[in-house]
């Protein structure tokens, strides 16, 4: 898939901007704080209806502006498509070919992107929340059913936590309602956990050989989904539900005392191991970076395998974080298959093969210009 044009209105430091992109590699050059990352973020938002940098939509709306709009014209294997995201204080709306979508989960997945930013190097060494968010964003864009179930899980979880907090503070002792919400929560939780485990298993199929190649055959990467409770069979929905019921039943009084839900997908994690050793605890910085790079490249292949179209790749100031060997592996992996967007403060750190195929743009104080 390819984005041909992007139009921004009142988006961060872009008052009104339109950019026409090249079909292969697009490089945005400029000093820090000029709007390069904002540009890549806009592509990410128009695809996934969420930012990779903030959870507050108002931060993306221009100063004292009522709303921001991102409009993209793209081409997929199935044909051309126009996408709109409108951000306002009232929320956000997504349109496909001018038609507003009833739910954002119906919108997400029309355009697929893979983002690789410096903070993604924290995928391995960061908190479990970072890894859960990674799964949710990547799996969500290829499975609307997963995204919808995750959203419903979040709503039920919020209700249950409010009730547990009230019970902790003696404002309510409604155990019957806790049981009702627990049953609803388990139904969604089991589906989310099963789909996440399947996704990690699929991702491992692609990431392991990539990691072997980058490490010159010296390292074997394995990925594991780690539920917050002991699950006898993560591939079996009924077994997951049974194990969740047991956990909630055993710890119900503890949850009331703590005023919060102690188990479920919102507390699960992913582990990365190299040659049997946990990379987060025992891996070198080089191994952690190779693992993050392998996982990101695996995403590209997994999305292609799922939908038959390559995603768009966003490289936000990340090439400078990789040595020449890892950089060359990244560039070799994308070749001419993937439309790529790169931000950098200088072209001096970029491989000559990149510059030979790239469309170059300067970014200065929210103004984007094509360099001939």
From Swiss-Prot:
Pfam families from the UniProt entry: SMC_N (PF02463)
The keyword Lyase is assigned to this record: no
GO MF: ATP binding; single-stranded DNA binding
Keywords tagged on the record: ATP-binding, Cytoplasm, DNA damage, DNA repair, DNA replication, DNA-binding, Nucleotide-binding, SOS response
CDD domains named in the record: ABC_RecF
Main location: cytoplasm
Localisation per UniProt entry: Cytoplasm
Chain residues that bind ATP: 30-37
Signal peptide: none
One GO cellular component, as annotated: cytoplasm
GO biological process: DNA replication; DNA synthesis involved in DNA repair; double-strand break repair; SOS response
Function according to Swiss-Prot or TrEMBL: The RecF protein is involved in DNA metabolism; it is required for DNA replication and normal SOS inducibility. RecF binds preferentially to single-stranded, linear DNA. It also seems to bind ATP.
Family: Belongs to the RecF family.
HAMAP family to which the protein is assigned, alphabetical: RecF
Name this protein carries in UniProt: DNA replication and repair protein RecF
Source organism of this protein record: Shouchella clausii (strain KSM-K16)
């Amino acid at each position: 898939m390819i984005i041909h044009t992007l139009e921004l209105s009142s988006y961060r430091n872009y008052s009104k901007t339109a950019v026409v992109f090249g079909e292969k590699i697009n490089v945005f050059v400029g000093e820090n704080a000029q709007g390069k990352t904002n540009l890549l973020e806009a592509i990410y938002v128009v695809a996934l209806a969420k930012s990779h940098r903030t959870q507050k939509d108002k931060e993306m709306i221009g100063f004292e502006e009522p709303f921001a709009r991102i409009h993209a014209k793209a081409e997929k294997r199935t044909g051309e498509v126009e996408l709109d995201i409108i951000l306002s204080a009232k929320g956000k709306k997504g349109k496909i070919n001018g038609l507003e979508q009833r739910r954002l989960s119906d919108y997400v997945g029309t355009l697929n992107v893979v983002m690789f930013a410096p903070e993604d190097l924290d995928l391995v060494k960061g908190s479990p929340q970072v890894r859960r968010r990674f799964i949710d964003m990547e799996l969500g864009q290829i499975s609307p059913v997963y995204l919808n179930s995750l959203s419903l899980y979040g709503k039920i979880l919020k209700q249950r936590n409010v009730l547990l907090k009230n019970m902790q503070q003696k404002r309510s002792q409604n155990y019957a309602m806790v049981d009702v919400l627990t049953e609803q929560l388990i139904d969604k939780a089991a589906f989310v956990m099963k789909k996440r485990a399947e996704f990690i298993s699929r991702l491992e199929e692609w990431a392991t050989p990539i990691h072997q190649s980058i490490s010159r055959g010296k390292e074997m990467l394995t990925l594991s989904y780690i539920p917050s409770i002991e699950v006898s069979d993560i591939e079996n929905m009924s077994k997951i539900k049974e194990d969740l019921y047991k956990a909630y039943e055993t710890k119900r009084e503890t949850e009331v005392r703590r005023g919060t839900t102690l188990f479920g997908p919102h507390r699960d994690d992913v582990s990365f191991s190299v040659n049997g050793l946990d990379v987060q605890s025992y891996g070198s910085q080089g191994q952690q970076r190779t693992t993050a790079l392998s996982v990101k490249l695996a995403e590209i292949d997994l999305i292609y395998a799922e939908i038959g179209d390559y995603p768009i790749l966003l490289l936000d100031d990340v090439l400078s974080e990789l040595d020449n060997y890892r950089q060359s592996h990244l560039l070799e992996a994308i070749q001419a298959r993937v439309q790529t967007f790169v931000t950098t403060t200088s072209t001096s750190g970029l491989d000559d093969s990149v510059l030979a195929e790239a469309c170059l743009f300067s970014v200065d104080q929210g103004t984007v210009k094509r360099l001939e």
